[in-house]
């Protein structure tokens, strides 16, 4: 196992993953912390011709399309930015208006997007 920093950037992740593929001949899978970096990783995987699975987080349309198209990108966990902003703003306003207790954690739903539901997924 290895950890590298693609800086959540497509072009940086492309180079990082190309190097990882060369350095690790038994590499079978990659997790990216966001779909932007994952798209760079996908380009590196496709360029290598290797069977390496890719997963990520965000649910960005480009990533969802890559999953639906049957690429090495097999899964992303979709976050819902509108809900994150709505809840965060509500908490900030509550505190501004005098609330003294704001929860340390507020769960917000996520959804796994894979080959079974990618064609029908949207935010």
Locate each region found by the language model.
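A residue-level marker of the well-folded mature domains of exported/periplasmic proteins
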Residues: 1-123
């Amino acid at each position: 196992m290895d950890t590298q920093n693609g800086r959540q950037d497509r072009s940086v992740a492309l180079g990082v993953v190309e190097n990882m593929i060369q350095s690790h001949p038994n590499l079978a899978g990659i997790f990216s912390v966001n779909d932007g970096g994952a798209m760079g990783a996908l380009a590196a995987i496709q360029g290598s011709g290797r069977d390496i699975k890719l997963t990520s987080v965000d649910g960005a349309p480009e990533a969802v399309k890559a999953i639906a198209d049957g690429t090495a990108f097999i899964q992303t966990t979709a976050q819902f930015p509108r809900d994150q902003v709505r809840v965060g703003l509500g908490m900030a306003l509550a505190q501004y208006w005098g609330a003294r207790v704001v929860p340390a954690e507020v769960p917000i739903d996520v959804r796994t997007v894979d080959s079974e539901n990618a064609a029908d997924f949207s935010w």
